[in-house]
Amino acid sequence: MEKYCTKLNEKTDEVLLSVKKAAKSISDMVAKTAGPFGSNVMLINGPNCRITKDGITVLRYIVEPETEADKIALSVIRSASDETNRKAGDGTTATCILANEIFQQGYQFLTAGLNGNLLRNGIVKASGIAQKMVVDSLSTPIKDDKDIYNVAKISANGSDEIAQILTDVFSKIGKDGMARVELSNTDKTTSKIVYGMNIDRGLESPYFATNEHGEAVLDNPVILLINKRLSVLGELLEPFKLLAKLNRPILVVAEGYDPDILNTLVLNKIRGLPICAILAPNYGEDRTKMMEDLAIVTGGKVISPQTGLTLESIISDQSILGTAKQVIVNGESTSIIADTSVIDKERLDKRVAEIDHVLEDETLNDHDKRIAKTRKARLVSGIGIISVGGATEAEMHEKKDLVDDAFASVSSSLKKGMCPGAGLTYLAIHDALYEWLTKHIAELSQEEASGFRIFADSLTKPFLTICGNSGNQNTQYALGCIQNTNRSEHGQDSELKPWTKCVDFSSGELVDVIERGIVDSAAAVIETMKNGASAGAQLLSLSGWVSTPPKPQVQQQM
């Protein structure tokens, strides 16, 4: 029974103080990387060393925290930054900074006797209002290649090379396009476009992943397209015996999976069968059309009641199976790099012409028009392949991190727009939140209002960090100057507008950040505030921990 024993630390003040110190230590390390003048961090793992300026990479590299407090702070902050990275591709350092600042400021209120859960309510409320401000007033859509270049350059830490490559790639794959980032065999970074299709469906289970990045990479797979829910285990047995004999990876695309079916597929994957399952794209009639599109791209056929094909049909007719050169599946989406030798060009052209004919219908509603445009884009666009080169393996890995983040940042910006960078958007929201609080203070309790102020005041920290990393010794003075400049420009205007005036930290001159191309992805700003607030509030509500004691080491007798 000893291995199930737990230890409860009931001294709340000691718990919070130790976690507070741990969170600050973690944040200080990550914050060094913020902004154009941020420092690199050396990651050392035995004889292997790696240099990075990527906040989330630093967080992921801390694998053995020394104390329970370190583990708690790291787990909460890293989870928040991971979520920001997954949704926006950028803003991970800002998420870490914001989460820690909320915790540090909130700690002072806790020691004064305020209720942590009510503080949390105020923090979360302020975060929700702030996110809406970005969507409603502070973001602008990406208009052209110049905007794409600027977003990519900021996310890639000022790399003109990466920004130009991504601009070229997105000009060819479109805003819904996908790209595969890989290491090159040379010192050059290059890109190319291959024919394929992207669908917004990811791994049905993380157990299907084949690499450390949580992706399933299937080379020359067989593809099974099933426009119905898989619910009868017996239907799979004979067809899958045949598929296993082909000695090729298997991608299953189906409307849905009963738990028993999915568990069986996962179990077979664990036992060595190279299989991956995803959901079919979209719903209803739209799903039927998209499955037929997939059949054209993969050279296969759709199994469904409408086509009259069943799983057993595979045994006598293997032409039902589709294929591809490669399929990459992550948690969110699937990229199919087509094997053009199996595509019926006449069938493909006819399909695109059918969609064009549908789009000519002036009575088409907005939903059907959007679906038709998406289908056409997926049928005619390609997939970007970016091969990252460098003089050393360490340089290649560092550059690949930047390309991954910049691609995701541009992709999210094309969907949600961009905002002024350099921390200015957070400063504009800071003022707007205080204006909101002045009008609605009666609606909040004392603790909730304090939590609201904690979040608002914490929004100045990203700017202060970027400013400090540039070598400025008086960051508070710089903050005051920038706030006064932008407040004066907007005057008494009650409408919330983006702040755009900031000091160029390299030259010291006052500039318009939009004109200088200093921009952030709106999605990154939104996710930073959402996840930073969640993490900071989580830490504030902590009162103790339960831990399993380490197993005693058994000394071997000589």
Predicted regions: what they are:
Residues 19, 35, 89, 113, ...:
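Residue-level signature of catalytic and energy-coupling elements of molecular machines
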Residues 17-19, 64, 69-71, 270, ...:
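Extended, low-charge hydrophobic alpha-helical regions
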Residues 1-83:
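Generic N-terminal targeting/processing segments that precede catalytic cores or assembly contacts
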Residues 6, 10, 84-94, 418-420:
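Glycine/serine-rich anion-binding loops at beta->alpha junctions
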Residues 15-18, 22, 26, 38, ...:
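Helical mechanochemical/support elements of P-loop NTPase systems and associated helical scaffolds
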Residues 85, 116-117, 121, 125, ...:
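Metallocofactor- and cofactor-centric catalytic cores in central/energy metabolism, strongly enriched
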Residues 85-97, 111, 116-119, 133-145:
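Short, flexible active-site-proximal loops enriched in glycine and acidic residues
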Residues 63-64, 128-420, 545-558:
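Long, structured protein-protein interaction/assembly regions in large complexes
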